[in-house]
Amino acid sequence: MYQKDNASLQIDLVFKCNDFSNLSDPFLYQPGNLIFESSFWEEVLLCWINIILSEKNTSFPNFIFDKKIFSLSLQIINNNEISSINQKWMDKSGPTDVLSFPMISDEDTTKNLNFIELGDLFISLEMAFQQSLEFDHSIKKEMLWLASHGFLHLLGWEHNDDNELDNMLNFQEYLISKLD
């Protein structure tokens, strides 16, 4: 996994994963599967933060580059829960794969702080599983894909046209490739 000599960076992750032990596919939810562990996501997110901060990518707000502590929540939930959130906050019906709710507003609110509250990230495990079958890759890869997409949104990256979306998707691939 990508390592940068920057031990002073920290991730403050509030992690929640529903109990999916009753799912019909035994390969999806297995105790010990890293995608269900907070420590796995802390390591992944810290790796991605290190990469982003070391590369000074211009797609992100400048004020994130002097922060040392990054706080966010990640919840792995089911289709019913993500449908409810999608309806309430996005005014869209039905489940979606990932929702992100960024907290970043502007430099003035964070300039004297060494931490930044990024926001909340919700991933539907059921949608991730369906998409992993559709795209013929592992559930872990799909979860990393969805997490990277939502995480980039938490950092302020938007895709308002096809070019911006292509750039974002390419950067997601890059981030995931650095985990190997």
Curated annotation (Swiss-Prot):
Q: Which GO terms describe its biological process?
A: rRNA processing
Please classify the protein's predominant subcellular localization into one broad category: cytoplasm
Enzyme nomenclature, EC number: 3.1.-.-
SUPFAM superfamilies linked to this entry: Metalloproteases ('zincins'), catalytic domain
Which compartments is it annotated to reside in? Cytoplasm
Keyword Membrane present in the record's keywords: the answer is no
Gene Ontology CC terms:
cytoplasm
Q: Which PROSITE patterns match?
A: UPF0054 (PS01306)
Under the GO molecular function aspect, what terms does this record hold? metalloendopeptidase activity; RNA endonuclease activity; zinc ion binding
Q: Which cofactor does it need?
A: Zn(2+)
Q: Which residues bind Zn(2+)?
A: 149, 153, 159
**Superkingdom, taxonomy of origin:** Bacteria
The alphabetized UniProt keywords are: Cytoplasm, Endonuclease, Hydrolase, Metal-binding, Nuclease, Ribosome biogenesis, rRNA processing, Zinc
Q: How is the cofactor bound?
A: Binds 1 zinc ion.
Instruction: Using the UniProt record, name the top-level EC class of this enzyme in a single word.
Output: hydrolase
| Reported function | Single strand-specific metallo-endoribonuclease involved in late-stage 70S ribosome quality control and in maturation of the 3' terminus of the 16S rRNA.
Q: Which PANTHER family match?
A: ENDORIBONUCLEASE YBEY, CHLOROPLASTIC
Family designation: Belongs to the endoribonuclease YbeY family.
Protein known as? Endoribonuclease YbeY
- According to its UniProt entry, this protein's organism is Prochlorococcus marinus (strain MIT 9515)
Quick one: which gene encodes this?
Answer: ybeY
